[in-house]
Amino acid sequence: MIRQTKTENGLVRGIEAADPRITAFRGVPFAAPPTGKNRWRAPQPCENWEGIKDCARFAPISVQDTPGIGDSLYNREWHVDQDVPMDEDCLYLNIWTGAKSVDDRRPVLVWYFGGGYQWGYTREMEFDGERLARQGVVVVTVNYRVNVFGFLSHPQLTKEQPEAPSNFGSLDQKAGLEWVVRNIANFGGDPNKITIAGQSCLLYTSDAADD
């Protein structure tokens, strides 16, 4: 099993999943924190780190409103657990792999959560990739900015960054996918066999992706 491996920015250590044949790498950074000077900007490259980064826990989710538990199925689905930490520093992804070595070259599924660009996060129980990883797939779930931090439209922001007007969350999704292409081989995945999937509004991502 691959319990420790390298990324382009440094070494990471995963954790044994409930099924000991699967390793989960949670909270792997794929871009610099979108805070301070990086707020409302396209995602910037992640800095290198020394030593081994412990990737046993999920990273905080993107800052978002909590719609609460109402009568509708939609509100009940997207009720944000009050115990889940939120932070602007949220550009992390999670990987589940059952590969025995980096030479396995298993097919890869990259999953994006939906939520009307307002809510959602990768640590929801239904997005846990362990079960699918048992079938020989390397599963990746990508966090991205939502709500005002991901899709705020303002003339000043458009003036400063005409190449990315109001679509910072979409650029996060693209950056996550590009990171997967560059790094997934070190988790036993095949960068030439990547399937993109999404829920609700994020179904468009698979159609928007190019070579």
List each language-model region with its residue ranges.
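Non-catalytic accessory segments of hydrolases
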Residues: 1-167
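Generic structural signal for alpha-helix termini and adjacent loop/cap motifs
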Residues: 99, 182-183, 187
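Short helix-terminating capping/connector loops at secondary-structure junctions
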Residues: 102-105, 187-191
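Amphipathic alpha-helical segments in well-structured domains
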Residues: 125-129, 170-173, 177, 203
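Short, solvent-exposed turn/loop segments enriched in Gly/Ser/Thr/Pro and often Arg
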Residues: 145-148, 197-201
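Alpha/beta-hydrolase active-site loop
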Residues: 164-184
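Alpha/beta-hydrolase fold nucleophile elbow
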Residues: 189-199
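Conserved small/polar residues in nucleotide/adenosyl-binding loops
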Residues: 204-211
